[in-house]
Amino acid sequence: MKLIDTHTHLYAPQFDSDRSELIHAAKMAGIQSVLLPNEDASSIPAIHALCEQEPDFAYPMMGLHPTSVDGDYINEMKKIEHALTRRKYYAIGEIGIDLYWDKQYCTEQKAAFETQLQWSLDLHLPVAIHMRDAFHETMDSIYKTGADRLKGVFHCFGGTTDEWNEISKLTAFYVGIGGIVTYKNNVLSETLKHIPIERIVLETDSPYLAPVPYRGKRNIPTYIIETAKKVADCYAIPVEKLAAITTRNSLELFAIPDKSIFDKKI
């Protein structure tokens, strides 16, 4: 069984003490690739270092996280834009609008988001969207920038069926399913009944949002298996089939190398 973790902060300081061991464990568990979303200019060196250490396993994104947007965001955006000229990236992310913690910089978040959406169009890259308490604002920016030309994933999706119905109109978008699907009384388990399996990818968002039975602990890429099992149950299919479909979806969206071809015997 092969899996792809489409969203992990494996470069973060929370993994400094045992990163190599966790990567080895992930590979042994069948995780063939991980995608690394950027946060701000300060996280760029760590992402690059991990991708250089694991060039056939870790694939970088580049973007400015909405909670890193403040009154000086334009200077931060210049650093992100410069980074995009320096090497290959597989998505613009993670980007979006987050009004959960603070609405002070809502205007700046929206401007940064729309600029980065345009970058994705210019560079022909997918986007990894962070959206929290900002569904309508996020969708407004997507339609304003070019909904018919954009592609990407709504990372850490936990929305309602009504929200999915709106997202479903964006035919080149997927939703990223993480550990919250394993939580008791979550809305997502019901929403999944309405989402075609061809429109989902799996993620951990590690070190955050660990799935049951690890909830409350540091999340790690290997725990994606627990999420895969739960999602497979929701679709009433074997987890191996779920893994194959979501891995194919991830490969199509992010255009990362398909490691499974190296597993085939000639």
Where are these regions (language model features)?
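Mid-domain alpha/beta scaffold segments of enzyme catalytic cores
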Residues: 1-266
